[in-house]
């Protein structure tokens, strides 16, 4: 099997910036079609990038892009994005569940509207976008669903920390495991991907902190590309860590993803324990 995304159609939630945009641009360099469903129609006062600027970058990178302004929580918006992808490019080969919300407050301090937001975007959005694309994935040659969610680390120090966020992210990973089983007979792969270290994104800079000890989003893009170009029938039901994927691909020098001149210890991401 030739490992390329040339001519493949990727339907992604979010993607205006950060990891999602990096994944989109890696696909675009192969000549993929990238359809982005995102709310960012106009610039954010503090964050760079909109769904329109992201599509412009996709096209400059060599792909074809389509922006769909909408909310992954809204069933009509999701249907619109699916239909737009099929109308523009003839089908859907890949779904990337990238959109996410984060609030690391304790259970006592977490406002229920923030809890609901995380559940609706993270867990429900993953289920909804995947569900809506299934009929079209069945018709694809090497169909994949890739969800940006963590391994199910049941250590109490993770389950009991920022519980509201943990529930929403683990729900995404359970969706991966369930879809992989449900769709195995159709040859549709479902996998999750999570970074070992913090990634230098707006969420890390603004919520988590520690961007100076973080890898670039490109490591997630390269790992996602590796997963999405594998045989869907043989690569499914995995909760991958980014650098493990790359090591399996024969990549041994991961320093290119670290900050220039950085020689210290990188900060581990949430849900990842020291080796």
Language-model regions: role of each:
Residues 138-139, 143-185, 196-199, 205:
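Catalytic loop of short-chain dehydrogenase/reductase
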Residues 3-88, 103:
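Short-chain dehydrogenase/reductase
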Residues 192-193, 209-275:
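C-terminal helical subdomain
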Residues 27, 91-93, 173-176, 183-195, ...:
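Conserved Rossmann-fold SDR core element
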């Amino acid at each position: 099997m030739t490992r390329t995304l040339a001519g493949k159609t990727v339907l992604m939630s979010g993607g205006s910036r950060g990891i999602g945009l990096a994944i989109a641009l890696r696909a675009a360099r192969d000549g993929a079609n990238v359809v982005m469903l995102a709310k960012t129609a106009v610039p954010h006062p503090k964050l760079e990038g909109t769904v329109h600027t992201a599509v412009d970058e996709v096209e400059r990178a060599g792909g074809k892009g389509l922006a769909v302004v909408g909310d992954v929580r809204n069933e009509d918006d999701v249907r619109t994005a699916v239909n737009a992808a099929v109308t523009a490019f003839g089908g859907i080969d890949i779904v990337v569940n990238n959109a996410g919300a984060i609030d690391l407050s304790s259970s006592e301090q977490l406002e229920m509207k923030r809890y609901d937001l995380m559940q609706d975007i993270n867990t429900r959005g993953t289920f909804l976008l995947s569900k809506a694309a299934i009929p079209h994935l069945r018709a694809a040659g090497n169909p994949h669903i890739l969800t940006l969610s963590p391994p199910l680390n049941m250590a109490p120090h993770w389950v009991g920390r920022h519980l509201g966020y943990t529930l929403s992210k683990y729900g995404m990973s359970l969706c991966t495991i369930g879809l992989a089983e449900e769709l195995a007979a159709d040859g549709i792969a479902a996998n999750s991907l999570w970074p070992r270290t913090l990634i230098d994104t707006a969420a890390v800079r603004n919520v988590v902190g520690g961007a100076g000890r973080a890898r670039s989003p490109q490591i997630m893009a390269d790992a996602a590309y590796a997963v999405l170009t594998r045989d869907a029938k043989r690569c499914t039901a995995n909760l991958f860590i980014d650098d493990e994927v790359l090591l399996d691909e024969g990549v041994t020098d991961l320093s290119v993803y670290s900050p220039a001149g950085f020689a210290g210890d990188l900060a581990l991401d949430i849900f990842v324990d020291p080796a």
